[in-house]
Design a protein with these regions (language model features):
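Short, solvent-exposed amphipathic alpha-helical segments in soluble enzyme
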Residues: 22-27, 80-81, 99
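N-terminal beta-loop-helix "entrance" segment that forms/cooperates
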Residues: 32-59
């Protein structure tokens, strides 16, 4: 299929709010741009919506919006990952996607 796929991992040690604000921002932006998407969160309630190796393999790009080293980082070995601060995602998710798409289309 020609549908673009993206996945993201949001991880913050400071409880839930930032993790979920970032995850929601990514999901809304991905949907608006016509991506298939899956966003894993790692917060004080553990891991939600966990990305499989298959999810990661099939993704056109991967965002890590993290304020802490996530669990099971080895899943991403050999993949290009865009690391972005949680605050940057929350404040300017469309700018983040613009930069990634420009980079990919280079």
């Amino acid at each position: 299929s020609m549908t673009k796929k993206m996945v993201a991992l949001c991880a913050c040690p400071m409880g839930l709010a930032h993790t979920f604000m970032a995850a929601e921002a990514i999901e809304v932006e991905a949907k608006n741009r016509g991506y298939e998407y899956k966003v894993e969160t790692q917060g004080s309630d553990g891991v939600q919506n966990k990305l499989s190796r298959n999810d990661i393999e099939e993704a056109d790009f991967i965002i890590h919006a993290i304020a802490v080293t996530p669990l099971e980082m080895e899943r991403f070995d050999g993949k290009e990952v865009y690391e972005v601060g949680l605050q940057e995602i929350i404040k300017n998710v469309s700018g983040v996607f613009d930069e990634i798409e420009a980079d990919l289309n280079n």
